[in-house]
């Protein structure tokens, strides 16, 4: 199993509020996307990722289904504690998406709209589930998936770490053999690059170069947000 990654500030933003962490040996991968003024978003995303990774590494045995909630709660509490000490950061928070690969299983969890995709030879499947206004509208049939991609409120999220003690968690298990690769990313990629283009890049580009090509494509389409990608060869 190999993993390669890249993060980029994008075209229009001054600061990069995304964060990523990879633990190759234990097959644990994190992407977080912070929000909040006064550079607070980049603090929130870093706290979340580092808190989760440290907690993960301390565990002798990791049961994703039962333990991932505890990791996310720890990350949430760490951000809230930081805000209590640094009141100028009030209002900051972060999304997070996590993937964990065991012998046969692929586990994914997320809070917010950072995503994980499963890549096969002929398809790209979103494995995570967005906590966002447009996702709710799609779910109740008010708008189509295609309309959601262009919706003016597509950046409004309905769950995040560091905002409140209560937050939504989505988690799911897949058969690892169903996919050749997984892609974790912030919405700076998913809002700018279509699934068809992602699949084309995975098909034609050398694995080591995929993160750069994905980031370059997002920037070529406008680069309206920070862009972070983690590509894992299963």
Tell what function each PLM region has.
Residues 1-234:
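PP2C/PPM-type serine/threonine phosphatase catalytic domain
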């Amino acid at each position: 199993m190999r993993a390669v990654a890249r993060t980029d500030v994008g075209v229009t933003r001054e600061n990069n509020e995304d964060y990523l962490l990879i633990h190759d040996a234990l097959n644990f991968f994190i992407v977080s996307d912070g929000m909040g003024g006064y550079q607070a978003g980049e603090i929130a995303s870093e706290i979340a990722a580092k808190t989760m990774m440290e907690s993960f590494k301390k565990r002798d045995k990791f049961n994703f289904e039962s333990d991932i909630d505890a990791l996310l709660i720890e990350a949430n509490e760490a951000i809230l504690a930081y805000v209590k000490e640094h009141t100028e950061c009030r209002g900051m928070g972060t999304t997070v998406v996590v993937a964990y690969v065991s012998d046969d299983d692929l586990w994914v969890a997320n809070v917010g709209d950072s995503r994980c995709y499963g890549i096969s030879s002929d398809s790209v499947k979103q494995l995570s589930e967005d906590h966002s206004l447009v996702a709710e509208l799609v779910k109740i049939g008010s708008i189509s998936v295609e309309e959601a991609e262009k919706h003016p409120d597509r950046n409004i999220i309905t769950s995040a770490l560091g905002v409140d003690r209560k937050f939504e968690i989505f988690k799911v298990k897949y058969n690892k053999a169903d996919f050749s690769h997984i892609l974790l990313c912030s919405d700076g990629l998913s809002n700018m690059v279509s699934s068809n283009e992602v699949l084309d890049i995975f098909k034609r580009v050398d694995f080591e170069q995929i993160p750069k090509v994905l980031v370059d494509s997002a920037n070529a389409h406008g680069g309206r947000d920070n862009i972070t990608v983690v590509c894992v060869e299963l």
